[in-house]
């Protein structure tokens, strides 16, 4: 309660609230990243691979990438192809994607969440650049875009650089 009431906007919003003891919870250190996304006979998908943030979650983007890429690995293995190069690329690209999502969208974002005008501007810019550089890729490039984690490969890299300039 004391934590929430330190912020002037939260204090105003909750001025008439009836508090229930023990009903306020928070967690620290939610983000995590698996050190290995795929290996010999396994691939992690969705939140099993990594989690960044509940507010601006890239979860659905990562689900589409990890499941599609895992399926491609399985199909290649069933055809008798060597999958080690694809596994190595998948691990490296996903690690770069995770780091770049953090740098582009999350780093220092919570520092100005209580500042409406600044947060609104950042949110609008984030959404616009997200749709131009991330969400549009499968529509522009087809299924090949689902096999590339966002912000880790050339088509979405410029959007990563633009987003991290103002966050």
Residue ranges and their predicted role:
Residues 1-22, 26, 50, 58-61, ...:
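Conserved FAD/dinucleotide-binding core of flavoprotein oxidoreductases
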Residues 2-6, 13, 89, 93, ...:
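Residues that form generic nucleotide/phosphate-binding pockets
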Residues 21-29, 89, 136-141, 152:
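A general structural signal for short secondary-structure boundary/capping elements
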Residues 24-50, 54:
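FAD-binding beta-loop-beta segment adjacent to the flavin cofactor pocket
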Residues 43, 62-65, 85:
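Conserved active-site and cofactor/substrate-binding residues in soluble primary-metabolism enzymes
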Residues 52-71:
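A conserved FAD-binding loop/helix module that cradles the flavin
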Residues 69-123, 134-135:
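Active-site-proximal substrate-binding core of FAD-dependent oxidoreductases
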Residues 112-167:
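C-terminal auxiliary extensions adjacent to catalytic cores
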């Amino acid at each position: 309660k004391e934590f929430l009431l330190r912020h002037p906007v939260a204090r105003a919003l909750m001025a008439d609230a009836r508090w229930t003891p023990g009903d306020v919870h928070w967690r620290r250190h939610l983000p995590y990243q698996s050190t290995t996304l795929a290996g010999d006979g396994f691939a992690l998908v969705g939140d099993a691979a990594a989690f960044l943030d509940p507010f601006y979650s890239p979860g659905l983007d990562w689900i589409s990438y990890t499941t599609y890429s895992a399926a491609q690995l399985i199909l290649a293995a069933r055809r008798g192809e060597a999958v080690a190069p694809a596994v190595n690329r998948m691990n490296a690209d996903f690690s770069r994607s995770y780091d770049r999502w953090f740098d582009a969208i999350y780093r220092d974002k919570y520092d100005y969440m209580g500042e409406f005008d600044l947060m609104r501007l950042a949110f609008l810019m984030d959404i616009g650049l997200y749709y131009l550089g991330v969400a549009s890729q499968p529509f522009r490039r087809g299924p090949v875009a689902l096999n590339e984690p966002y912000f880790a490969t050339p088509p979405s890299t410029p959007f990563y650089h633009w987003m991290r300039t103002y966050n």
